[in-house]
Amino acid sequence: MDEETGGVGKDSRFPSGMTTRKATAKATASAKATANAKISAKAGAPVELTVLQTLHQRIAGCKQCPRLREYGENIGRVKRRAYIDQEYWAKPVPGFGDENARIQIVGLAPGAHGANRTGRPFTGDGAGNFMYPVLHELGLANHGNAVSRDDGLKLKHTWIGSVVRCAPPGDKPTPAEVRNCAAHFAAESAALSKVKVVVALGKIAWDGFLAHMLNAGVIERRSAYTFRHGAEYRLPNGIWLVGSYHPSLRNTNTGRLNKVMFAKVFVRARELAGLR
């Protein structure tokens, strides 16, 4: 739903209760095991995987939500006429960007014919066509043309992910599906240890992020943090939360969100992250 409008333990930024803690611990242990087992990348030797790369293999193979997997796979078989000759990713979509990111962008879920097709957040749809050129203009991306995983796009100081990793029917995941995905979001976010600013695209992403903070004991109540475009709050753990309208075609075509408004959010995010 790239088109939608809308660490573990006490010191972690993004856990969501015991279920998430256990899942995150499992993911971390798996990553450490992989790191310990590999040898240096000499000629003919396996390439070293980072913690995030190992986690992303787990995310792409997740089958906790049969309804979402079935929907994404079916979309990949039926396809949209414009993409009839393309092979769809049609599985959970990992995050993307700079592993040393200081800015973390949070969306809701992959678009059925966007990230569910290309396998990368906000890639191959109208929202990405609006967002990536702005990131490029602000020095957060090496170019602004996001069409596929092999288009050479690289982010700088920035990471993009979502609170749900599979494309949901009608752009509406169930509460249980959101909870199932919380462990992936927590583990991925915990690995992004240098993040200073979280930019939530739309109220649903905003609420999803705050739910993690509430379950982690970082905040006492979500109602203290009201969503609006340009809203910013410094959370008790030192992370800045910044809000933006989602760059959906619904918002950009109606003028609710324009590039000047969107760019201002990321200019401010850069400042809060210490990127002058």
Q: Residue locations for each model-derived region?
A:
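A polyanion-binding, active-site-adjacent surface
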Residues: 47-276
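Intrinsic disorder/low-complexity segments
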Residues: 1-50
